[in-house]
């Protein structure tokens, strides 16, 4: 293979702070700081909204959106009553988004870059912040497995395993 599979890359970084209840596994995102590469932003307010929404969706994917299957292979979590997607209240209490506003070197509209899907992956920072919080329940030097999605039940189980180490 030769060729160029992508016209350009959009980069981003996120740092997330969480808190966990070690008796129940309940958790909350307290703060997130994001910088995202938008190229020359065509509409900064719109781009920030897209970045925030994609982050919350990505964090939900890794913390609450659990697929449960029955013994017969049917999806049990197929409705809003059984499949927990993020709500407005699940966004970080402190949410800072900065745009890395450098013109795209490629010939794109207004030298801009995509902001709809790439920031989705920044939600991974919420999952790893939970993993760090679980590790802090021990001596902080050992990480036990935390399965995704990191539901309250899975966080609690990881805390218990961490304390047993």
Label the model's feature ranges.
Residues 1-165:
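Cofactor-binding beta-sheet edge motifs in enzyme active sites
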